[in-house]
Structures are given as C-alpha cells and as structure tokens.
Regions:
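An N-terminal-biased, well-structured beta-alpha scaffold segment characteristic
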Residues: 2-114, 118-120
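Conserved small/polar residues in nucleotide/adenosyl-binding loops
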Residues: 131-138
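Short, acidic/small-residue loops that bind anionic groups at enzyme active sites
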Residues: 122-127
C-alpha cells in the first residue's frame, strides 16, 4: 500500500498529517510513504527527517495523488491555485482519503458529492472520539 502526504494548501494551515515518527512506523510495517517536499516545514519537520524515516519525497502534489492508495491530510481538499485544479480532481477512483471533512456543514456538501462522483472513499475525523483511558461515556 502506498500512503500519500501532500502539503496542506489552506491559507494559514501549518500542520502536516504525518510526522517523521509516524512515517517511520508506517515504513516499518512495509508501507510506502510519499511525502510532498516541504509538507512538514510549517510544523518544523524538515524533508531530511522524512527521508531518514524512509519516506520518498515528491516534488509535485499531483504525483502524490496519482500514486497513493491512501491520502492523509489535515484539512479538506481545496482548489490548488498553483496547479490550476482542485485536489479532488487529482484523486482517483478507489483512493482513500482520511482528513477533517466536516461533511455536515452545508458549504461542504458539494465537495462530498464531488468526491463520491470521483469514486474517492473518504473517512472524516470530525466524528471520531479518541480516548487514551476509559471515560464515563464508555
């Protein structure tokens, strides 16, 4: 399986969906990880750290989207000004996307429909509750 980590393009978004540590873990489990060059810079993770972790650094976000079976992002897919097309248009049928999509928000309904029409399987982190210990809700 090939995991893709593109650079976030939302204005002001400096986070990255995978750290060098998580990349090393994925590579150690036999996965191939593609990281767009500069993807971690806003979070103070530099390309050589990703290379040391076993990632393949990729210049072009389109290559990340074309080659990956699963895309990890922080924010929803947007229009990529530099490429002149939307990130969704770079995705392919059967590709998985894990990110924060906010599908219930009316402004995002069209985006969700566009991903479905493209055949992208999206998993949103919005509704996931993560606990490290039992809580009264368990």
């Amino acid at each position: 399986m090939i995991i893709g980590v593109p650079k976030e393009i939302m204005s002001g978004e400096d986070r990255v969906a995978a750290t060098p540590e998580t990349v090393a873990d994925m590579v150690g489990k036999g996965l191939t990880v593609l990281v767009e060059k500069g993807a971690g810079e806003g979070s103070f993770f530099h390309d050589p750290e990703y290379v040391s972790a076993g990632a393949e650094m990729v210049d072009d976000p389109e290559e990340v989207y074309q080659r990956a079976d699963l895309i990890l992002k922080v924010k929803e897919p947007l229009y990529n000004e530099a490429k002149g097309r939307s990130e969704i248009s770079m995705m392919h049928k059967g590709q998985y996307l894990i990110t924060f999509i906010h599908p219930a928000a009316p402004p995002n309904h069209e985006m969700v429909k566009e991903m479905a029409a493209q055949g992208v399987i999206s998993l949103t982190l919005d509704g996931c509750l993560l606990y490290t210990s039992p809580s009264p809700r368990d």
